[in-house]
Amino acid sequence: MRIEEDLKLGFKDVLIRPKRSTLKSRSDVELERQFTFKHSGQTWSGVPIIAANMDTVGTFAMATALASFDILTAVHKHYSVEEWNAFAASASADVLKHVMVSTGTSDTDFEKTKQILIANPALNFLCIDVANGYSEHFVQFVSKAREAWPDKTIIAGNVVTGEMCEELILAGADIVKVGIGPGSVCTTRVKTGVGYPQLSAVIECADAAHGLGGQIISDGGCTMPGDVAKAFGGGADFVMLGGMLAGHEESGGTVVEENGEKFMLFYGMSSESAMNRHVGGVAQYRAAEGKTVKLPLRGPVENTARDVMGGLRSACTYVGASRLKELTKRTTFIRVQEQENRIFNSL
């Protein structure tokens, strides 16, 4: 046993210090980025925000809606091969280039993914997603996937430390997904005591990944557009959003009505709700590590997408970054004890 004395920070612990700027308008800020990925050699350009691979967020409808903003969607892994084929046949090439196929690490997952990618060669992203990316089996699966699909851009996660980020990139991942426990409907930290404050995880993993020519996704912990800006400021190449994109028309959650008001169910992928739906319940040897919440219906996701992108542009103008790529170079974080004046928050 040992204790690390270094302070670790989340998004709520900091603000971004403003700096002199020559930008005249938020409209001068370019949010689009271009990446060429280490192993696949693929090039992608767009706004590096990703809808999370949760079945109440990462739907085909969400992918179609967000593609118009050049935003990516990691489509959840519970669609069948037939559903994938039908979607790919009806979607435009522009939509498909903003879509990630998600998979677990079982033999069944591998065979299903193989069928999807063979039938739909226009799909270029593969997101290999498990709650705990520290297992030897997971690293072996990433290597197996890289060998099977050398020209696909592979995302692997989740981890929160530099050495594991490096191991996954060396095993064949182009992009590493960073975050254990920060999600709005994740209870891993309270059920297990395991986790890492998200901003510090992003800073550490970005340094490790960039040293090897890889990229990272900050996954979880964002509750508002300012948090998205902080994640990019900390060095994230992409930011994945779950709760911020839940509850919309495209989110796919079950709609319930209470006292004349409609709500949409949103749950973590390790919650009892998710396991009841997909694997027949919570196994006796494990605990649920997620919760279910009811969100007021929020309308089309385009309004939220515009809000997030507008907040990002504004953050860039405050520090003089004319492009999103420059934000991390222009970011100085200051530690704080308050984020906002909350006097009217209850009204």
From Swiss-Prot:
NADP(+) binds at residues 108-131, 216-239. Pfam families: IMPDH. K(+) binds at G181, G183. One of its GO terms (cellular component) is GMP reductase complex. GO terms for molecular function: GMP reductase activity; metal ion binding. GO terms for biological process: purine nucleotide metabolic process. The keyword Oxidoreductase applies. It comes from the Bacteria. It catalyses: IMP + NH4(+) + NADP(+) = GMP + NADPH + 2 H(+). Its EC number is 1.7.1.7. The keyword Oxidoreductase applies. Homotetramer. Catalyzes the irreversible NADPH-dependent deamination of GMP to IMP. It functions in the conversion of nucleobase, nucleoside and nucleotide derivatives of G to A nucleotides, and in maintaining the intracellular balance of A and G nucleotides. This is GMP reductase. The gene is guaC.
